Amino acid sequence: MAFAWKKNFSYSKYASICSQTVRQALKPEIKNEVKTHGDAEFLYTRWKNGAQEKTESYNSAKSADKE
């Protein structure tokens, strides 16, 4: 049984399915609170020809609002 399970699912896929199922089962009040836990914010800098260019920030919550 374990061999068949490993053949079809990686642990990452299994964890993704479990977390998605739990999120779908939550009450609406809690769902809104949980959605914000997945947001990511970070800074990144592009490099070109060995020189640093402008540093930019990224916020997944703001980019999701634009869509």
Swiss-Prot record:
Keyword entries, A-Z: ATP synthesis, CF(1), Hydrogen ion transport, Ion transport, Membrane, Mitochondrion, Mitochondrion inner membrane, Transport
Any single GO CC term annotated in Swiss-Prot or TrEMBL for this entry: matrix side of mitochondrial inner membrane
Subcellular location: Mitochondrion; Mitochondrion inner membrane
Keyword Ion transport set for record: yes
InterPro entries named in the record: ATP_synth_F1_esu_mt, ATP_synth_F1_esu_sf_mt
GO aspect biological process, one term: proton motive force-driven mitochondrial ATP synthesis
PANTHER family (UniProt xref): ATP SYNTHASE EPSILON CHAIN, MITOCHONDRIAL, ATP SYNTHASE SUBUNIT EPSILON, MITOCHONDRIAL
Role summary: Mitochondrial membrane ATP synthase (F(1)F(0) ATP synthase or Complex V) produces ATP from ADP in the presence of a proton gradient across the membrane which is generated by electron transport complexes of the respiratory chain. F-type ATPases consist of two structural domains, F(1) - containing the extramembraneous catalytic core, and F(0) - containing the membrane proton channel, linked together by a central stalk and a peripheral stalk. During catalysis, ATP synthesis in the catalytic domain of F(1) is coupled via a rotary mechanism of the central stalk subunits to proton translocation.
Family: Belongs to the eukaryotic ATPase epsilon family.
Binding partners and assembly: F-type ATPases have 2 components, CF(1) - the catalytic core - and CF(0) - the membrane proton channel. CF(1) has five subunits: alpha(3), beta(3), gamma(1), delta(1), epsilon(1). CF(0) seems to have nine subunits: a, b, c, d, e, f, g, F6 and 8 (or A6L).
Protein name in the entry: Putative ATP synthase subunit epsilon, mitochondrial
Organism field: Schizosaccharomyces pombe (strain 972 / ATCC 24843)
